[in-house]
């Protein structure tokens, strides 16, 4: 049997994989308005999925959205001003690009660490280390 024939046969016998090709997905923000306050209901689950501290993500959101806010006793974020889910999601996506995904291999298997006062992103998958904008 020729190589090309064996390759064709193997490709025919390989089952198709259903589902998404990405293993890392950030939950869509669950947002609701309370007057002039935007409440981010699933903030805790988002931070858990990102593997980052709540305070760090909150600080980024405040800076990116140009507003003030706090984390309430239920773990929800309360931001001053009206922000829709699309704007919050865009801000979280920026956070992921800057502080979660490795700049070399693109995987989310990273940790934030401080070295000589600088905040670095260390990838556990490829070993790369890169400076963040913080």
UniProtKB/Swiss-Prot annotation:
The gene is eif2b. eIF-2 functions in the early steps of protein synthesis by forming a ternary complex with GTP and initiator tRNA. Residues 1-28 are annotated as: Disordered. HAMAP family: eIF_2_beta (MF_00232). Residues 1-12 have a biased composition (Basic and acidic residues). It comes from Haloarcula marismortui (strain ATCC 43049 / DSM 3752 / JCM 8966 / VKM B-1809). Belongs to the eIF-2-beta/eIF-5 family. Heterotrimer composed of an alpha, a beta and a gamma chain. Keywords: Initiation factor, Protein biosynthesis. PANTHER family: EUKARYOTIC TRANSLATION INITIATION FACTOR (PTHR23001), EUKARYOTIC TRANSLATION INITIATION FACTOR 2 SUBUNIT 2 (PTHR23001:SF3). The keyword Transferase does not apply. This is Translation initiation factor 2 subunit beta. Pfam families: eIF-5_eIF-2B. NCBIfam families: PRK03988.1. It comes from the Archaea. The keyword Cell wall biogenesis/degradation does not apply. GO terms for molecular function: translation initiation factor activity.
